[in-house]
């Protein structure tokens, strides 16, 4: 699993936290950030540079015949697919954690209101 990331020398893809991708001139720059260990101030990161692929395609709209376009490197596309799998999986886990915490807060509120209601009923009974 995650063969493309392992080919880049990333032995533990599960430690990846996030990534950024930007374009500089005719290159795409991929920066991968790893989770921080306790006591570390900065997250470890690695940077990779991919040249953009140049393709000549027919241009029927301008009537010129052909034009050159730059595209993302095919290998980089595969690496990004793997990174998205890892990073989106983390997002789903975070979303689930937030949902559970929200449900817990709501339950606390409902229970507190019910306790107050029961105490009020008890107070009415003791005043009689």
Curated annotation (Swiss-Prot):
Signal peptide positions (record): none
Regarding protein family, the annotation reads: Belongs to the UPF0325 family.
Protein name, please?
UPF0325 protein PMI2289
Among HAMAP family, the record links this protein to: UPF0325 (MF_01519)
What InterPro entries does the record tag this protein with?
UPF0325
Output the superkingdom of the source species.
Bacteria
A Pfam family of the record is DUF3461
